[in-house]
Regions:
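Residue-level recognition of well-ordered beta-strand positions that form the cores
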Residues: 65-69, 82-84, 118, 134-138, ...
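Short, surface-exposed binding/anchoring microloops in extracellular/periplasmic proteins
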Residues: 35-88
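A short, sequence-level motif marking secondary-structure junctions
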Residues: 52, 97-101, 151-157
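Sec-dependent bacterial lipoprotein signal peptides
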Residues: 1-19
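Short, solvent-exposed, Trp/other aromatic-anchored flexible loops in extracytoplasmic proteins
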Residues: 90-145
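Bacterial signal peptide processing site
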Residues: 22-24
Length: 162
């Protein structure tokens, strides 16, 4: 019984010591966490549930969901989606392409995709009025079309203490 108590006290002491090994300087610093949601639509397409997360260390862009609202997309064989900032020059945040090589058609609606890393090269100030979505399609006849939607961006969170 004494051995069990000695082991329990040793484990408790180790736990207390290790709990103090947290990065103390970072716990007192203010960390910037910003979360933006975005969506937009026109008569042809709708983008919803998009999210951009910036925490000072990592940047993540979830493209959201694409929905077609027209019959123009029933014979698509190739398409690409791009989310970009339209400033002095076009800054691409996320881009995906799908190409069917079998001669069949592709459903354009669905998840746009996700990317993490250095998503925003400069600051996030440009997100509010300059975020755009672009869909380029090619149909069975080889006809190419481009659809653009300006995305309404809303900042959900601001500065938080960690």
């Amino acid at each position: 019984m004494k051995e069990i108590m000695a082991v329990m006290l040793s484990l408790l002491a180790c736990t207390v010591l290790l709990a103090g090994c947290n990065n103390f300087s970072e716990s007192n610093e203010e960390q910037s966490l910003k979360v933006y949601s975005f969506s937009g639509e026109n008569e042809y397409i709708s983008v919803s549930n998009g999210v951009i997360i910036l925490d000072g260390k990592e940047e993540i862009c979830y493209g959201g969901d694409l929905k077609v609202m027209s019959d123009n997309f029933s014979d698509i064989t190739t398409y690409s989606t791009t989310i970009y900032i339209n400033g002095s020059e076009k800054e691409t945040l996320l881009s995906n392409s799908v190409d069917d090589q079998t001669g069949e058609t592709i459903d354009v609606s669905g998840n746009i995709g996700k990317i993490s890393g250095d998503v925003l090269r400069d600051s996030d100030d440009k997100l509010t009025d300059n975020l755009w979505f672009e869909l380029k399609t090619t149909n069975l006849s080889g006809e190419e079309n481009t659809y653009r939607v300006q995305l309404k961006t809303t900042e959900i969170t601001k500065e938080v203490k960690k």
